[in-house]
Every structure is written in structure tokens, then in C-alpha cells.
């Protein structure tokens, strides 16, 4: 499959890189990593980005190139990274002549002409990194750093159960590139004084319900705390270390799309099937969902509690 993907990339002058909506470290990491791979391995390629790049995470990658959107005037190859199904792709892939899908989620939609899918991988960035290692294609320190950030983000610093020997193999390979590991971790995890205010707000307002802990940040709360909606979701693991809480959630108001984003985490209770029911998806113990209104929240909580009590 890897040889087929490299051959397909070589066939096209124009390539557009996609990833999922509401991007995380792995989405951006695999997207930037694939960009770097193509630019350093192939000649005369026009590489474009699809999707919203307004997230606070983008600056953490220190990308110095231009994020250009494609015009599709020439036949374009689309490469979709870290996205399980077509509905979650941030951008219109129908404008591409052919599609390559590279993903690590549970397989529900093999929408590519070529599909590199490994649901046992810790991250899409891990798949891309081992892709590089095994075929000795070229990468710069920027690309290696981006992929490493993707792995770190999706494994929560190698803490999640999907971490295995391949994860460390990929990390070791990337570590051989010249980037500042300490600076990388500081960009990803260093907090600011205002984050303490957010922590205090969440700890004073979160709700516990029969093994489920969650906090809700309305738009007025986000403005009061001076954080973005995406940043509001980042504090979900603040509730992760309490033994009595089997599942924990961050629920943030998305005024742009008139809905509520839910980040779902657990230690041992699978939540991805529940997330699928509420317009989302993801991994067994880390998923995302969307509520059309808070009226749906009791239904979601009941589904989670039923799963806990099975």
C-alpha cells in the first residue's frame, strides 16, 4: 500500500491535504508532516491545505510556509488524514480527481481510492512516521516535530492504551531529527496564569452524576474566561484522575455552528459508539460528539450511565 501511495503522489502535480473538523494535535501534526514529506521527497509539487486554520494549536507548530487553499484548476490528488468518515472531513473532497485516506480510527468508511487504515495505531502521525521510516522518504526537522506532536497529543504523552512498541519506534525515529524536545513540550503543555482561572472555574462548577463528571462552558463563560471554544475543551482531563469518575466530559458552546461540542474521555468504558450516536466519533476511550442543544445532554448522560452499569 505504501508503494501505491508514493506512486500516486508522484503522478500528480497538485495535491491537497485534508483532515477532520475541530482539529487536534494529531490532525494538524499528520497534515503538516505529510506536507513536509511531499515537499522534501518529490519535485515540482504544488501542495495545498484544506480546512480551518484558526485554531490556537496552529501557532504551536511554528509553520513558516504559506497555508494556501487549492483552486482545483489542475487535476488534484486529495490526501485525507486522521478522519474516519466523509462527514468529518474539513473541506470538499469531491473536487479532487482521486483520494487517499490515511487514518487510525475504527474503520467505518473507506472513502478513498487508496485506503491506509490501521485502527490499532495510536495516531495517524504514527502511521505517517512509520511510513517514512520504512520507505526512507525525506523529512525535515519541522515535519518530524509536527509528527511527534501528533503522537504525543493523541497518546497523551504515551499514557493511553493504544500506545505500543510501534508508537515508541515511530517516536524514536522522529527523535533522531534535530528539534528541541524541551521547547516542543513547553509549547504544548506550558500553562499561563489565566489557565489557573479556568481550572478554578471548572472545579467550582463541574457536575458529577453517577460516575460521570462534566463541565459546561457557555459562550458567556468562554468570554469571561477569555478563551476560545477549542481551548475550553482542552481542560477535559482536569477531571481524569479521580477514581470515582469513570467517564468525564467537556461541553462547550459553539456559537458559530449553533451547537455544543462534547469531548468524551474514560479509562475503561468505551465511549466511541455513544459519540457516534451524537454526531461524532473517535476512539474507544477518547471521542467527540455534537449536541444540537443542551436539551440533548440528559439523553447523552443516560446513555453513558447505562454503559457504565453494563
Spans of features found by a protein language model:
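Glycine-rich, phosphate-binding/catalytic loops in enzymes
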Residues: 33-35, 95-99, 117-118, 169
Amino acid at each position: 500500500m505504501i508503494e501505491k501511495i508514493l506512486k500516486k503522489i508522484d503522478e500528480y502535480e497538485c495535491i491537497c491535504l485534508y483532515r477532520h473538523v475541530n482539529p487536534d494535535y494529531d490532525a494538524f501534526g499528520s497534515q503538516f508532516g505529510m506536507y513536509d514529506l511531499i515537499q522534501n521527497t518529490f519535485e515540482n509539487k504544488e501542495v495545498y491545505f484544506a480546512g480551518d486554520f484558526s485554531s490556537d494549536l496552529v501557532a504551536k507548530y511554528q509553520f513558516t510556509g504559506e497555508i494556501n487553499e487549492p483552486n482545483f484548476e489542475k487535476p488534484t490528488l486529495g490526501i485525507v488524514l486522521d478522519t474516519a468518515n466523509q462527514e468529518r472531513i474539513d473541506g470538499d473532497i469531491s473536487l479532487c480527481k482521486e483520494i487517499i485516506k490515511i487514518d487510525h480510527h475504527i474503520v467505518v468508511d473507506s472513502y478513498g481510492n487508496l485506503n491506509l487504515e490501521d485502527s490499532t495505531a495510536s495516531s495517524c502521525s504514527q502511521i505517517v512516521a512509520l511510513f517514512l521510516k520504512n520507505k526512507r522518504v525525506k523529512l525535515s526537522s519541522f515535519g518530524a516535530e509536527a509528527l511527534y506532536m501528533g503522537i504525543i497529543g493523541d497518546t497523551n504523552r504515551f499514557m493511553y492504551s493504544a500506545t505500543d512498541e510501534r508508537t515508541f519506534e515511530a517516536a524514536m525515529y522522529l527523535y533522531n531529527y534535530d528539534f528541541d524536545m524541551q521547547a516542543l513540550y513547553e509549547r504544548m503543555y506550558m500553562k499561563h496564569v489565566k489557565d489557573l482561572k479556568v481550572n478554578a472555574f471548572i472545579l467550582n462548577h463541574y457536575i458529577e452524576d453517577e460516575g460521570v463528571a462534566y463541565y459546561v462552558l457557555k459562550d458567556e463563560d468562554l468570554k469571561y474566561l477569555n478563551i476560545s471554544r477549542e481551548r475550553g475543551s482542552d481542560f477535559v482531563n482536569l477531571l481524569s484522575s479521580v477514581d470515582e469518575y469513570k467517564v468525564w466530559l467537556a461541553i462547550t458552546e459553539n456559537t458559530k455552528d449553533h451547537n455544543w461540542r462534547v469531548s468524551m474521555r474514560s479509562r475503561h468504558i468505551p465511549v466511541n459508539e455513544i459519540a457516534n450516536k451524537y454526531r461524532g466519533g473517535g476512539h474507544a476511550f477518547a471521542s467527540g460528539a455534537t449536541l444540537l442543544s443542551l436539551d440533548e445532554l440528559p439523553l447523552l448522560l443516560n446513555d453513558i450511565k447505562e454503559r457504565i452499569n453494563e
